[in-house]
């Protein structure tokens, strides 16, 4: 089934505008009663059947986790000391009280046991004494997962606190600008809604999640710049500069900086995406998908961490400064074509692509934009012999030149964008929980989402889940006619009932609901509801 299409309505523009909002809309006087009415409607519509929600809004779940559970993640290798018994182990699962680990034995095997958080060595001095006694037990393949002791020393004072509770109004951190990541500013926290932060720098305000890759500890930018200049452009560091004139001291000097440990994982990772690699792009309104490809522009100083994309001839630009927008490899609105195809969504093709006979839209786009040297191409990475006219279960082989068999097709795989975030999330769930999650995913019927209003504010809005597959949801949003697509880990997506936790009025209308209760999806495949 070919679900792609051509359209002349192409407006490639992106700036994460929803992150640049001054305030929430809260027009309801009795917020609590209004929100309870929404919850009652949703539960009645779902026949009071429990909803599965572990696979969505994982950034908010992570921000609410205690620091000790957040840092001691699955597969992390630590050193444990029980009286005179010192041994290394790998974390399997954890709960608020204790940990279930795999102890490495002299025989090379593993023994599953339970340990307390207090049993783990968390100071450098103790580790230096203990490690020589047991390091020979750690398999070579597990050394990459060995814990970083300096991070645990920094975290010790906050170990029992929730992660989001460490960020308080008045504290400061360094914020890398999303529409110009070559620059960063000193930002002050104004509000904290369970990790979703309103921050200000000089006269500007912006919403951003505390676990965004653009949030960093004080001193990050200076250190990053120094390491970049010392090691050269081909390293993991970035060429960033502080925006002049925007340094503003905190109004509450007692609060100072956000604890450094909060941002330990917040940095865009380097990528190796080849030029002209094709992907699918979800627009800023989150309603339309476009064929797109990776390009490099002169405005992007950090090409190892960020890249630009183009929809045909049109660069995706920032609405705020018309500068080519710079994406990181896990950006939630970039999808592999294979995922979009499985979702069976319409993918818009630029109007200047002229399809050849029996040519798919994907092949037409690749031929037109992704390798100017080729007249024809297919979407296959490894080409069969040019004598073969058609590949089984694949597109036509249109290039009959002798070197066609050696050309690789620039089509991005699953390790990018929203799908990569989904994969990382699923890999950290124990096997027995993962199977249960996949079976029950189709019970998710309602959620809450921040949507921009005509006045330029964010409004927490009611939404009904009309389809889901892998890393994406399709939503029917109150007050909007077209479906909205959103990545499971998008920080604007919340569980049902978040309005009560944050005490924000939710936007919903009675006509949004069909009076009939929802029925269970009979077409669900292993817990996935097809779009």
Swiss-Prot record:
GO terms for biological process: anterior/posterior pattern specification; axon guidance; negative regulation of DNA-templated transcription; negative regulation of multicellular organism growth; nematode larval development; neuron fate specification; regulation of cell migration. GO terms for molecular function: chromatin binding; histone binding. Disulfide bonds: none annotated. InterPro entries: Mbt. It is found in: Cytoplasm; Nucleus. Disruption phenotype: Worms exhibit ectopic expression of Hox genes and homeotic transformations. Mutants are also long and exhibit defects in distal tip cell migration. Its main location: cytoplasm. The keyword Transferase does not apply. Gene3D superfamilies: 2.30.30.140. Probably acts synergistically with sop-2 to maintain the transcriptionally repressive state of homeotic genes in order to regulate various neurogenic identities. Specification of some neuronal identities also involves expression of non-Hox genes. Specifies dopaminergic and serotonergic neuronal cell fate, and regulates neurotransmitter choice and axon pathfinding. This is Sop-2-related protein 3. It comes from Caenorhabditis elegans. The gene is sor-3.
